[in-house]
UniProtKB/Swiss-Prot annotation:
Lineage: Eukaryota, Metazoa, Chordata, Craniata, Vertebrata
Disulfide bonds: 265-290, 267-283
Family membership: Belongs to the sarcoglycan beta/delta/gamma/zeta family.
Role played: Component of the sarcoglycan complex, a subcomplex of the dystrophin-glycoprotein complex which forms a link between the F-actin cytoskeleton and the extracellular matrix.
Record keyword Cell membrane present: yes
Protein name: Gamma-sarcoglycan
Gene name of the record: SGCG
Residues bearing carbohydrate: 110
Record topology, Extracellular segments: 59-291
Transmembrane annotation, as ranges: 38-58
Annotated source species: Bos taurus (Bovine)
UniProt main location, coarse: membrane
Length: 291
């Protein structure tokens, strides 16, 4: 309680103080005072709860001066230990694992990595899905550890840079268009087979085609004609024995006259046929085979 007294005093004048003095009460009393104390108490409780929750979050999330939990902030970037889940897109410049461990990217649906230009357009994409791996780019390359290109794909060609391309499928390799290669050979215990089931098979080389079987034989089977044609050279059959077992055979002459010998006759169109050998040529006797 504060009492204020207002008295005017004039020099040389004596005034007696009144018996009834005015008293003014300044402050908060009653239920307002109790509500104020209650509000301050609640505010203090909320402050303590917030402080306790802050301490608990710091302990649970493993906050430290260098980062949060397994996530450490270093001069080179962010260092993350253990497994992490990203619920939204992740934009980074470089991702690499520790020296003693591998890098694993895993998702229940698919893993998609995009490369964008300065305008935000996708210039390259790698998508690993549950059924296929999809690559979208102008060129796809696989290099060896020393930087040698092993496999290159673009819109115009597919290039294999290895010393050997091996196809192990039971159906072999299927090519819808032409193939350029300096050498085609099978595994040592297997046979080499070139087949075109419904169309023709063509082999072209400006400096020649060499077919060699050092330890076996070469067979050419066809239902129609086999044509050996040389425009400026010679067709050479270089062997100790040349057999033509299915040549047309003329009629047999008198018994004992030929002694089992035949002569090879040539028609004007190049057709060959056999005629029983005699004292002289007998080709004209069987010239009807040329008709």
């Amino acid at each position: 309680m504060v009492r204020e007294q207002y008295t005017t005093i004039t020099e040389g004048t004596h005034i007696e103080r009144p018996e009834n003095q005015a008293v003014y009460k300044i402050g908060i009393y009653g239920w307002r005072k109790r509500c104020l104390y209650l509000f301050v108490l609640l505010l203090l409780i909320v402050l303590l709860v917030n402080f306790a929750l802050t301490i608990w979050i710091l302990r649970v999330m493993w906050f430290s001066p260098v980062g949060m939990g397994h996530l450490h902030v270093t001069a080179d970037g962010l260092h993350l230990e253990g497994e992490s889940e990203f619920l939204f897109p992740l934009y980074v410049k470089e991702i690499r694992s520790r020296v003693d461990s591998s890098l694993l990217l895993q998702s229940t649906q698919n893993v998609t990595m995009n490369a964008r230009n300065t305008e935000g357009e996708v210039t390259g994409r790698l998508k690993v899905g549950p059924q296929m791996v999809e690559v979208q780019s102008q060129q796809f390359q696989i290099h060896s550890k020393d930087g040698k290109p092993l496999f290159t794909v673009d819109e115009e060609k597919v290039m294999v840079g290895t010393d050997k391309l091996r196809v192990t499928g039971p159906e072999g390799a299927l090519f819808e268009h032409s193939v350029e290669t300096p050498l085609v050979r099978p595994d040592p215990p297997q046979d080499l087979r070139l087949e075109s089931p419904t169309r023709s098979l063509s082999m072209d080389a400006p400096k020649g085609i060499h077919i060699q079987a050092p330890a076996g034989k070469i067979e050419a089977l066809t239902q129609m004609d086999i044509v050996l044609q040389s425009s400026d050279g010679t067709v050479v059959l270089d062997a100790e024995t040349v057999c033509l077992p299915e040549l047309a055979l003329g009629s047999q002459g008198p018994a004992g006259s030929s002694q089992g010998l035949y002569e090879v006759c040539v028609c004007p169109d190049g057709k060959l046929y056999l005629s029983v050998a005699g004292m002289g040529t007998t080709c004209h006797e069987h010239s009807h085979l040329c008709l």
